[in-house]
Curated annotation (Swiss-Prot):
Binds 2 manganese ions. This is Phosphopentomutase. The lineage of its organism: Bacteria, Pseudomonadati, Pseudomonadota, Gammaproteobacteria, Alteromonadales. Mn(2+) 1 binds at D10, D338, H339. Pathway: Carbohydrate degradation; 2-deoxy-D-ribose 1-phosphate degradation; D-glyceraldehyde 3-phosphate and acetaldehyde from 2-deoxy-alpha-D-ribose 1-phosphate: step 1/2. Its EC number is 5.4.2.7. Mn(2+) 2 binds at D297, H302, H350. Isomerase that catalyzes the conversion of deoxy-ribose 1-phosphate (dRib-1-P) and ribose 1-phosphate (Rib-1-P) to deoxy-ribose 5-phosphate (dRib-5-P) and ribose 5-phosphate (Rib-5-P), respectively. GO terms for cellular component: cytosol. The gene is deoB. GO terms for molecular function: magnesium ion binding; manganese ion binding; phosphopentomutase activity. It comes from Colwellia psychrerythraea (strain 34H / ATCC BAA-681). It is found in: Cytoplasm.
Length: 404
């Protein structure tokens, strides 16, 4: 029976969507804008021969009605299209849950105040339950900036650094040695329980190391504590029917470990890619391998590093043929994204954009999937592939990728 591989190139948006005006994101285009910035800075065109052959660049051109400097080729061996998000937010859980067939049609809770962001009553509850005398931060911040600003005070006082953003998150940074990784995880678990009716999507543990503001750096031991999806995702449905669902990276955390049978953690593009290849080489028939390449978002999108983002895409492109070589005749590969995070855009937050929908198997020719009305088309296609009950949202494109 077939195996499927889903790889999420985290934050690779391909052009602002029609509702971007509601998010202040009209003009955002993660892919095109980073490619332009790369060309302007280096004088080089981004070199993506393998992703372009799959239709990634063509999908961006169709979604945004614009082009950009690149070296590549016309689509020749993959189905390509672009999908619009119908979920109310542009956050990680919303994007992933929607691509798994369950869009988020309710409003998340947010901490909207830029300073003194958390309710006093919540902070009091956290201090009482954890035994700490207070918190540092209590504001909107980027993860790197707040470590530079408060990392030393955290080491000296022992107080956790708590901060948020435009997303529905409560983030907690703590030093792995001075605070302790297990203590950080326990603290996050307590906060998750105390958030209660505030409807906050995720509590995120952000461990770091270093001995001064000059070298504080996050580690790969991040952990996300998500609420449950509002309905069974396609992962739940196929797992219940016997498909072996494998998470690589932070997928299991995003889905609150629901519908996941096996988990592999890894840090960095190459380690995540290697773990994915290992599973392709060893996974049984009737398996789904689901990988999130988080570094595109956290290392380059949020940090507004267009040049680094472009180089990382080139590094990914070099490795794409390894997927083809590892895949069996029955396997199908999907490449997509969960939202945008334009590294040329003001601020540090996600951007509301179309995402690519790319599909590949060994017998496929080039197929234009066009404009998909929801990320859930991917989940519906996976449901059909594994012959389980249809999802409530989305239109399968499975017949289109096997029609030629």
């Amino acid at each position: 029976m077939a195996r499927a591989i889903i790889i999420v190139i985290d934050s690779l948006g391909i052009g602002y969507s029609p509702d971007a005006v509601d998010f202040g994101d009209v003009g955002a285009n993660t892919f095109a804008n980073l490619a332009r910035a790369y060309y302007e800075e280096t004088g080089k065109e981004i070199f993506l021969p393998n992703l372009s052959a799959l239709g990634m660049i063509k999908a961006c051109e169709q979604a945004s009605n614009q082009t950009f400097p690149y070296q590549g080729q016309e689509p020749s061996k993959g189905a390509y299209g672009f999908a619009q998000e119908i979920s109310t937010g542009k956050d990680t859980p919303s994007g992933h849950w929607e691509m798994a067939g369950v869009p988020v049609l309710f409003d998340w809770g947010y901490f909207t105040d830029k300073n003194s962001s958390f309710p006093t009553s919540l902070i009091d509850d956290i201090n009482r339950e954890t035994g700490f005398d207070g918190i540092l931060g209590n504001c909107h911040a980027s993860g790197t900036e707040i470590l530079t600003r408060l990392g030393q005070e955290h080491i000296e006082t022992g107080l956790p650094i708590c901060y948020t953003s435009a997303d529905s998150v409560f983030q907690i940074a703590a030093h792995e040695e001075h605070f302790g990784l297990d203590n950080l995880y326990k603290y996050c678990e307590t906060v998750r329980e105390l958030l209660g009716d505030l409807n906050i999507g995720r509590v995120i543990a952000r461990p770091f190391v270093g001995d001064s503001a000059d070298n504080f750096a996050r580690t790969g031991n991040r952990r996300d504590y998500s609420v449950l999806p509002p309905a069974p995702t396609v992962l739940d449905k196929i797992s219940q029917e016997g498909t072996h669902v494998i998470s690589v990276g932070k997928i299991a955390d995003i889905f609150a470990h629901q519908g996941i049978d096996e988990k592999t953690k890894a840090t960095g593009l190459n380690a995540l890619f290697d773990a994915t290849l290992d599973h392709i080489n060893t996974a049984q028939d009737n398996s789904l391998i689901f990988t999130n390449l988080v570094n595109f978002d956290q290392d380059f999108g949020h940090r507004r590093d267009a040049i680094g983002y472009a180089k990382e895409l080139e590094a990914l492109d070099v490795r794409i043929p390894e997927l083809f070589h590892a895949m069996s005749a029955e396997d199908v590969l999907f490449l997509t994204a969960d939202h945008g995070c334009d590294p040329t855009w003001p601020g540090t937050e996600h951007t509301r954009e179309y995402v690519p929908i790319i599909a590949y198997h060994h017998q496929i020719d080039s197929v234009n999937l066009g404009n998909r009305k929801t990320f859930a088309d991917l989940g519906q296609s996976v449901a059909e592939l594994f012959n389980v009950e249809a999802m409530d949202y989305g239109t399968s494109f499975l017949s289109e990728i096997y029609s030629k």
